[in-house]
Amino acid sequence: DLHYIARRQRQMCIRDSYKKGKFVSIQLYNALSFNFYYLGNKDESIEMWNKITQISKVDVGYAPWVIEESKTVFESRVLPLLLDDNNHYRLYGIFLLHQLNGKEILMTEDIWSILESMNDYEKLYLTYLVQGLTLNKLDFIHRGMQRLYNFKQFKYNTSLFTDWINQAEMIIAENVDLVDVDRYVAAFVYLSYRRSSQPFTKRQLMDDFNVSRYKLNKTIEFIL
């Protein structure tokens, strides 16, 4: 493989400089860490990355294995959602893209063209995420997704997230106060799982979402 040979040769030059004590810097450790990682030497890659974090006083970005994990998640989960015909799937895809560490590296011209071809609502959500616009309705949907994402068992459950977007839009249409998203997400999760083989108890959800039994019951009634 020509890429492997080129990376191996580059690694030999970098290591030679490192051993001779030349140009010992954050850039050198960074190059060593990335080259070690892609040559299959993760332990040495971690060692070099640790040196960066020890000497740097500023944010040094993400380690190569973190970026590689983001690439895997992007290709297997995010991209299919962004290309889906259903706009709720696309919104969830935009949300997941925003969660990825080192996402800037993934933003090729092809990905930008996909995002630029989306509808106005999806572009508005992108702008909300990037620029921090005050958009109460999209903010409510987003905060709900963020709460779901914080739970490991939910974070890649596509049907749960797209159902939440649909449910959130119905809640918004009722013109209720949208500040307290936790009560709505807790009630939504309870109703989503109540007929499953592993339903959540109200006590579990009260603890997980810091919601009182009264609020949870009232919100379940409201959604029903």
Predicted stretch roles:
Residues M145-V185:
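Intrinsic, low-complexity N-terminal interaction/targeting segments
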Residues R8, N30-N35, V60-E69, L91-N101, ...:
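Structural detector for internal amphipathic alpha-helices that build alpha-solenoid repeat scaffolds
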